[in-house]
Amino acid sequence: MQKTDLFMARTEGYWNYRVPGILCTANGVILATVEARTGAGGDWDGNDILLRRSLDGGISWQPPQRIVAHDTYGPGPVSNFVLFADADGTVHALYCHAYNRVFYLASGDGGASFSPPVEVTGALNAFRAEYPWRVIATGPGHGIQLRGGRLVVPVWMSDGSGTEFGAGKLGHRPSEVATIYSDDGGTTWQCGEIFAHSDGQIINPSETLAVELDDGRVLCNIRSESPQNRRLISVSPDGAGQWSKPLFDEALLEPVCMGSLLRLRQPNAEGRGVYLFANPDNLENELTPPGRNLAHDRKRLSVKMSVNDCTTWPISRVLEAGPSGYSDLAEAPDGSILCIYERGMLNRMTDTASVAVARFDRAWLSAGE
């Protein structure tokens, strides 16, 4: 196990760094992204997107480069940056501005440069026939490419009526979850079905992870603020529609925090897919005042393994015992696993001290606690 701090709070003119993403391209380049936050580091402060690249499987990293700057878009943050690794080597990306505009860009050189952004918000307006969203966000984390070539990423949306951010700012609650997808390599995007609703049984479903199962179905693992304090699971035959009723997974605790989900390239000895899930595996309230949206301490970041299509998670190991929040997972060319995550805290739980990347192998994970 090796841990490296990639972005340190209070450096390079930013207050802190949050919402990390990580991806291994088809050509083996590792890309690590963060929201570089100004102001007080809140969701609505001025955020840029920074990227670091690794050409040796996550051992060493090139200096940060700013790939999206919020001040070129007007007031509001740039956020929820999502990367996709295309089998042809292309890197696709989606991100949001001010939680009401969505943009697409791409890289053909492993993230060394990106195309000019193209706004795709118009495609997402189709959701308004069912839900009058005023706030919308992609991911975060990474999107996926299905074996048939389709690009899929979950999105969450809100009517903005929540008051949690104060006067003049749209709320992120109540919220709903859907997917968007592209069948032409990111050129155009389509709306999937809205499949997780704030309906009283489920409370404020939001940041969602997608993975392709052994038989080609797509599973979504959903954050929510439901009192069951468990992750929600829904499955679709194609990542777009016919979603199953979301059900709580008793094995996966929900402290109200984004998680991460990854299918490894190589199956196990029986030919079954190997899946990893990471999130703060904790329901204590030593660091977080109880009662706020049922949130619990973001600590004890753990990685779990499944070999039966995410049905059970018999293997689990703590990666970071202390404060640790949002994360994302990738697999390096040599099979090493990379987990990028929010590490440590300063003034409050969401004032992240650093964004770090941990590098480990299956043997470390299988060894357990």
Description of each model-found segment:
Residues 1-369:
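Asp-box/BNR beta-propeller blade signature and adjacent active/binding-site loops
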